[in-house]
Design a protein with these regions (language model features):
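Cell-envelope/extracellular polymer assembly enzymes that use nucleotide-activated donors
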Residues: 2-5, 33, 186
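Short, well-formed alpha-helical segments that are part of the catalytic scaffolds
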Residues: 12-26
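A conserved acidic beta->alpha catalytic loop
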Residues: 38-47
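Donor-binding/catalytic cores of nucleotide-activated saccharide
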Residues: 69, 90-201, 206-224, 265-266, ...
């Protein structure tokens, strides 16, 4: 019986395959299979895999046209026969030699749908380093055997440091979306919102080769990748919000804002046009000023159910608006109108803040605000008329 099927998408990984397969062969759990999904590699990866399959009897090779790692992982899951599913990228490693065995035994004992472990970073010279995500509390470090709720996991990152019961994934039809970038958090968000509890083990399963994988910026480097990466945020937010995973969702929204404020991203007009297209359905005007785009996005992402993140976003917007005002930078009335709408919807009175009250008065007395008054009045009147018609029909 195959206890764990390890899924490994392979695209032009000829430099790493021998080392990665050797690393996996050292795991103390021997009842495993490694499903290598060759994703249309154009280098010597397939030939190397075939030689490795002769050497290691646990290797199975699947070939597909180049469709991306998400589709490759789905293909691997469909062809897996193991009780549990694990994931491994061609340039990464498993750290503790008994990690899979510990996780399988604990998961099997408790009939767990998901078993979590810990992760290390692999430096450019191959040394293991601590994972900074634990210090930043992006997700939880497991210091002992135990059980946690899915809400305690943290933001849906590092899916590969966990194993998942295959029958659970099939039952809930959980797969990777067909995105060029960002498919991993969508997959893990689906898991977290479907699983009842997570069994955790104090072991280092995964070694992520950060030097080779790079950060998001190095991977999101053309229009389609940027589009998919921003879409993954929207998809993940919806999954989490629909399941009332408010705290995790809002924490991930903060990650998006932080990402967009990075120096390299602030100067990427193409990226912000994509952000505007995906997130700002109620605003047809693209703001040429990056700060205005970020402010409007923050207002679109506000969710009052989580007080901490709501306060974070509102205070961020408020301080940016006030800073623009005292520096004599004209504030777009569309942004301030959205700000007042958010405050009104959350029963927060802007009049309790003298500075913002003054700013509101200045904007409402400005020429740009007065010039757009007929448009706003017409829009409001149209909405009222439509509501009356709807009520009569009902």
């Amino acid at each position: 019986m195959v206890k764990i099927s390890v899924i490994m998408p392979v695209y032009n990984g000829e430099k790493y395959l021998e080392k990665t397969c050797l690393n996996l062969s050292k795991q103390t759990l021997t009842d495993i299979e490694l499903i290598c999904v060759n994703d249309g590699s154009t280098d010597n990866s397939l030939n190397i895999l075939e030689k490795l399959a002769d050497k290691y009897d646990f290797i199975k090779i699947i070939n597909q046209e180049n469709q991306g790692s998400g589709v490759a992982r789905n293909n691997g899951i469909e062809n897996a026969i193991g009780e549990y599913i694990a994931f491994l990228d061609a340039d990464d490693i498993y750290v503790d030699v008994d990690a899979l065995e510990k996780m399988y035994e604990y998961g099997s004992k408790h009939d767990a749908d998901m078993v979590g472990a810990n992760q290390k970073r692999v430096s450019i010279d191959g040394n293991l380093e601590d994972n900074f995500n634990y210090k930043q509390k992006n997700y939880t470090y497991f210091s002992d055997y135990g059980v946690i709720s899915p809400q305690e996991y943290g933001i849906p990152w590092a899916f590969y440091k966990n194993i998942f019961k295959r029958s659970f994934l099939n039952k809930h039809n959980i797969t990777f979306p067909n995105l060029k970038r960002g498919q991993d958090p969508v997959f893990l968000a689906e898991v977290l919102t479907k699983v009842n509890q997570i069994y955790v083990v104090c072991t280092d399963l995964y070694g992520y080769n950060y030097a080779l994988g790079g950060g998001a910026n190095s991977k999101v480097n053309d229009y389609n990748k940027k589009l998919d990466y921003m879409n993954h945020y929207k998809m993940t937010f919806k999954i989490l919000d629909d399941a009332h995973f408010t705290e995790i969702s809002n924490s991930y929204k903060k990650q998006l804002i932080t990402y967009l404020k990075l120096k390299n991203n602030r100067n990427d007009k193409e990226l912000f046009e994509i952000v505007h297209k995906i997130f700002e359905d109620d605003n047809k005007t693209y703001f040429e000023n990056v700060d205005e785009e970020i402010i409007y996005l923050e207002l679109c992402l506000v969710n009052p159910e989580n007080k901490d993140v709501y306060t974070f976003l509102i205070e961020s917007v408020k301080s940016q608006l006030y800073s623009m005002n005292i520096n004599n930078i004209q504030i777009n009335p569309v942004i301030f109108k959205k700000y007042l709408e958010v405050l009104s919807a959350t029963n927060y009175s802007p009049s309790t803040n003298p500075e913002m009250c003054q700013l509101r008065d200045e904007i409402e007395n400005s020429n740009s605000w007065k010039c757009t008054l007929p448009i706003r009045l017409t829009k409001n009147m149209t909405i009222k008329v439509l509501k009356k018609i709807k009520n009569k029909v009902l």
